């Protein structure tokens, strides 16, 4: 898991979408969000990974393609918000990585197993996502112990305990 690097300056106008180029990841919905933000006069920019190209005429979207782990961490630390508009995910590690970097996360209501510090749009409408982005923008969050139960170590410990209980039942 990553930690916050105080030397990296966060850009209050930078939103991030990390994920492969797959319809389930919600790139197209994120592009709609950016179009609406631009229509409202916002100067926010979406940086997205997993895609080489952006829709024609999109001046507020930057495609990074596939990025290294180091580039991913830098993007997480520079961004003011991570979007997770995915239709479904198992345990979305990218959300936990973002939170570990101090980056707020706005995730689809369809995603479960996330800490309670994740922002949710309420209704899954374009307007509710855009309204919440404008509300969250540039907020500094304090997570406290909320992430501990979702850390890799904690999940591994719980799985190990579960498997040991199955293999070695109590007498």
Question: Where would I find each of the regions flagged by the language model?
Answer:
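Short alpha-helical donor nucleotide-sugar binding micro-motif in glycosyltransferases
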Residues: 74-79
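Aromatic "clamp/platform" in nucleotide-sugar-dependent glycosyltransferases that forms part
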Residues: 87
């Amino acid at each position: 898991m990553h930690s916050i690097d105080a030397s990296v300056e966060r850009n209050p106008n930078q939103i991030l979408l990390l994920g492969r180029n797959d319809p389930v990841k919600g790139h197209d919905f994120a592009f709609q969000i950016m179009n609406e933000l631009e229509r409202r006069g916002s100067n926010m920019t979406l940086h997205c990974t997993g895609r080489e190209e952006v829709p024609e005429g999109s001046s507020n979207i930057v495609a990074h393609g596939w990025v290294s782990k180091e580039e991913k961490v830098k993007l997480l630390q520079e961004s003011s918000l991570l979007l997770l508009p995915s239709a479904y995910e198992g345990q979305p590690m990218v959300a936990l990585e973002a939170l570990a970097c101090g980056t707020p996360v706005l995730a689809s209501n369809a995603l479960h197993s996330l800490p309670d510090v994740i922002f949710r749009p309420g209704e899954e409408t374009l307007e509710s996502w855009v309204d919440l982005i404008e509300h969250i923008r540039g907020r500094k969050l304090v997570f406290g112990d909320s992430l501990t139960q979702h850390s890799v170590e904690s999940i591994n410990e719980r799985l190990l305990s579960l498997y040991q209980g199955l293999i070695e039942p109590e007498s």
